A protein has these predicted regions:
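Acidic, proline/glycine-rich low-complexity IDRs
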Residues: 1-23, 110-167
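Long, contiguous N-terminal structural blocks used for assembly/anchoring
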Residues: 1-99
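Amphipathic protein-protein interaction modules
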Residues: 61-144
C-alpha cells in the first residue's frame, strides 16, 4: 500500500509498510537535510503529512520557534542548552569557536544560539499526540569540528517537547 500526497509525492515502500522521504531545503545560505519516516504506513494520516509539509515550507519559522525554545531553556534548572554551550566551549579550540560565532551582540549565550546551524529536521508523522516528537531539529555550532548536537523535539503543534544534547 502507498500514500499519495501533493507535497511528498508517493510514499510507501515494500518494506513492511514503512514510509520514508528525504530532501534538502535551503535555510538562508545553508542546506538542511529533511526526512520523514514512519515504521507503519497505516498510522500516517494525510493531516499529519499536511502539517509536516507546512512546516517544511516555512522552515524559517520552524527554526525560529525551535531557537526561541532554546532561549527559554537557558533559565531552566537543568538546562540542556547551557550544557551544550559549555561542552562546545570546552571541546572546540578558540579559532573554531570564533569562526562559528557569527553574531556579536555582547550577550555570548544569545550570540551562540543565534549562530547555531540547523543540520537536519526529521519528521515522524505517526507521532501526533501533544507529548510526542513530531519534528526533531538537530543543531550544531560547528558541524566540521564537532559531532555533538543540540536537539529540539517539537510536537505536531510546533511546541517544544524536549531539548537534549546528543553525541
Amino acid at each position: 500500500m502507498t500514500i499519495e500526497h501533493d507535497f511528498f509525492g508517493i510514499l510507501g515502500s515494500d518494506d513492511e509498510g514503512e514510509v520514508y522521504w528525504s530532501e534538502q531545503v535551503e535555510l538562508g545560505s545553508e542546506s538542511v537535510d529533511i526526512d520523514l519516516n514512519s515504521p507503519d504506513e497505516a498510522s500516517v494520516s494525510v493531516e499529519a503529512l499536511d502539517i509536516a509539509a507546512a512546516m517544511i515550507r516555512s522552515i524559517e519559522d520552524l527554526d525560529s520557534q525551535a531557537k526561541e525554545s532554546l532561549v527559554a531553556d537557558l533559565s531552566a534548572e537543568n538546562s540542556q542548552t547551557l550544557q551544550y554551550i559549555r561542552q562546545a566551549v570546552e571541546e572546540l579550540d578558540d579559532e573554531a569557536l570564533a569562526n562559528a560565532l557569527i553574531w556579536d551582540s555582547g550577550d555570548r549565550q544569545i550570540d551562540f544560539l543565534r549562530s547555531l546551524r540547523l543540520q537536519r529536521v526529521g519528521f515522524r508523522p505517526h507521532h501526533t499526540a501533544s507529548d510526542e516528537h513530531f519534528a526533531v531539529l538537530d543543531y550544531s555550532i560547528s558541524p566540521d569540528d564537532t559531532d555533538t548536537l543540540l536537539v529540539v523535539a517539537l510536537d505536531v503543534n510546533g511546541d517544544p517537547v524536549t531539548i537534549s544534547v546528543e553525541s
